[in-house]
């Protein structure tokens, strides 16, 4: 496990820092001359994917708190009017604080420039996990998300996940299901655009856990019929 962590972990860390330094962040401009309600809904669903937390399953916490950095990105299954806006990365900073051995607080915050907008997002919620003496450790979480800053819209969502951890050879694989319930409000003075949009996203979650000492790396993929959300998070244990 240590060898695998060393090779894979160093590669992921290098990729994350390279992305933070040189990547183009995601766009948030929704006004288009050729408006499509289907494309707009997929755009909002993609932003919801990027907004929700990568909630890693920490089985044996050696620290009371974990801080970290993360990146998320979406891939569409078919061409979309908002392809460019959805192709960039979304950065965030995270904190997981254990209240008890089985319950911990989830916090995420992000702020970055996107064209002429300063985008803000913050998430908070809780995760409940099983004990360490079960064959398949599990975790369920609820996270409340908020996005503001773009001139065209604001977005809120509630993220629900249920996942288990399976040991396969030397790897820990996370498998689960998730639901995103979102509500978007648009500020455009255009009769063709709706004033609001609500919906739900159901998806399959697949991830891996790489942990050594107080450092953890958690890549994760979310599968939805219209898009794939990928994210990676690196954490450090403190306290």
Which residues make up each language-model segment?
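Outer-membrane beta-barrel architecture
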Residues: 94-96, 123-129, 161-165, 205-209, ...
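Contiguous hydrophobic, core-forming segments of folded domains
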Residues: 128-148
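Secondary-structure boundary elements
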Residues: 101, 132-136, 167-170, 211
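A short, polar/proline- and glycine-enriched secondary-structure boundary/capping micro-motif
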Residues: 117-118, 185-186, 228-232
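Bacterial N-terminal signal peptides that target proteins for export
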Residues: 2-12
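Outer-membrane beta-barrel transmembrane domain signature
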Residues: 24-60, 64, 70-85, 145-218, ...
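Glycine- and aromatic-enriched membrane insertion/assembly motifs of diderm outer-membrane
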Residues: 81-135
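N-terminal signal peptide c-region/cleavage motif recognized by signal peptidases
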Residues: 18-21
